[in-house]
Amino acid sequence: MSRRCDSDAVNFRKDGDSPQWPKLIGTAAASSLATLFLVRNFFPAEKKVRHSIRADYTVGDDTFVRTMGNLLGPPLLEGNKVTPLENGDQIFPAMLNGIRSAQRTITFENFLFREGEVSDAFAEALADRARNGVKVHFLQDALGCDAVHGRAIKLMKRAGVAVEIFRFVHFSRINFRTHRKILVIDGVRGFIGGVGIADDWKGTGRTHGLWRDSHYEVRGPVVAQLQQAFMDNWLETRAELLHGDPYFPTQERAGDQTCQIFKSSAGEGSDSGRL
């Protein structure tokens, strides 16, 4: 009896049953890949620096202005005008007005672009300017677009808009995106902020399910820095350098505000945040 029990205990797999170890190995491999994906995309390797924050300067200190320019790259520039825009009912009309007024160039970099009324309006405005001889450059993040081959993108391409998709999604770099929202008109009028080109931002920000957000219209010398920020990812994606007066015209003084465009990217980790 005991021998039969021992035999039954050893020979637990019946004829026709599949072995379990391939499934266990597959599960372990999948878990390892998932862990590697999370670590690679959300916890980039970088040296951790712990320190207290001291108030070394006041905002109006000339030394602060010089230091910020030296550390962050571009200098702080005087003579700008910044107009705050709140929510879709202010932001979208201002941006569309800027696009429709363009005479020479439009550069537009965006993260979120979802098909709907808002994206259709922007696609039609950009397409119209391209048909009228304006050089239109549209750079769209791959992950943020729900229809890379949708009607809006196709409309722009048919009209002559130079459309580029930034970093098609790859497993090991899925989180390396561009979240920049940059629109520059004729090199002299810029828009920057948090809004996406989607119906989710329509209205006043008081409707349930729709976003509240801020954007800014910028005029003056700092627009050249905004244009240069667009050129970073355009050059990476298309290997085309946009230059000359149509993109970088002489900037006139537009107001009395001091501004600086500070750039960051996914590959920089938290270094930019520390600065």
Question: How should these model regions be labeled?
Answer:
Residues 1-7:
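Charged, low-complexity N-terminal segments of organelle-associated membrane proteins
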Residues 11-275:
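Charged, low-complexity intrinsically disordered terminal segments
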